[in-house]
Design a protein with these regions (language model features):
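A late C-terminal transmembrane helix in Major Facilitator Superfamily
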Residues: 163-190
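Cytoplasmic membrane-interface "Motif A"-like loop-to-helix N-cap segments
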Residues: 98-113
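Paired intracellular helix-loop junctions of major facilitator superfamily
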Residues: 102, 156-166
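C-terminal ends and interior cores of transmembrane alpha-helices
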Residues: 114-128
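Hydrophobic core of transmembrane alpha-helices in multi-pass small-molecule transporters
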Residues: 131-155
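Juxtamembrane intracellular "pre-TM" segments in multi-pass secondary transporters
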Residues: 3-42, 67
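Extracytoplasmic gate region of multi-pass secondary transporters
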Residues: 35-93, 149, 153-154, 181-188
Length: 190
């Protein structure tokens, strides 16, 4: 409250006009992001992660019914584990990278990426009804996706981009992610 010496919350801040030099530096930083191979590698990685994420979300129940013989109720239950574990992975991604790996996100991103591959192999390559194996696959997949959404989908790009162009880095990765998600629908629908 203002009576305690705090500023009013309803007063709009004055927008400072950027000088020509600041504008040129800002534009240069954004172009620099587009020229960074690491940003494009992150964007491609995020696109592939979104392909696998939306493939499981879109086709997981059908796959479990058609290929493994689950009932609709059991298949839906197994697939519903994935987003719940994704929330948990997202919640703990910062703790994992900051506390366990000292702020380095590349090592946990690799670990959780490999965990996703392992989970997909369990899910797709173990034939027949093995309820607990499929549940384990969705737990691992969901946790991995939750962490990777945070790392690949944003934090790693912001970490390596110039501070005044972090929005451009997030934009490149975000666009690639949703292109991957859209392509998954087209590719798997054929």
């Amino acid at each position: 409250p203002e009576s305690m010496g705090f500023p009013s919350v309803n007063v709009p801040k004055q927008k400072k006009e950027m000088s020509a030099t600041e504008t040129a530096d800002f534009n240069k930083a954004q172009r620099q992001v587009l020229m960074m191979p690491a940003i494009w590698i992150l964007a491609l990685s995020s696109a592939f992660m979104y392909i696998s994420r939306y493939a499981i979300n879109s086709w997981g129940v059908f796959y479990l019914e058609a290929q493994k013989g689950y009932s609709t109720l059991d298949a839906s239950f197994i697939i519903s584990i994935c987003p719940v574990c994704g929330i948990i992975g997202t919640m703990f991604s910062g703790v994992i990278s900051d506390k366990l790996f000292g702020g380095r996100r590349n090592v946990p991103a690799l670990i959780f990426g490999l965990m996703n591959v392992f989970a997909l192999c369990l899910f797709l390559l173990v034939p027949g009804v093995h309820f607990w194996i499929d549940v384990l696959a969705m737990i691992l997949f969901g946790l991995g996706i939750g962490v990777l959404i945070c790392f690949l989908g944003g934090l790693m790009a912001v970490d390596i981009a110039p501070r005044n162009a972090s929005g451009a880095a997030l934009g490149v990765v975000g666009i690639a992610s949703y292109i991957g998600a859209g392509l998954q629908d087209v590719m798997s629908g054929i």
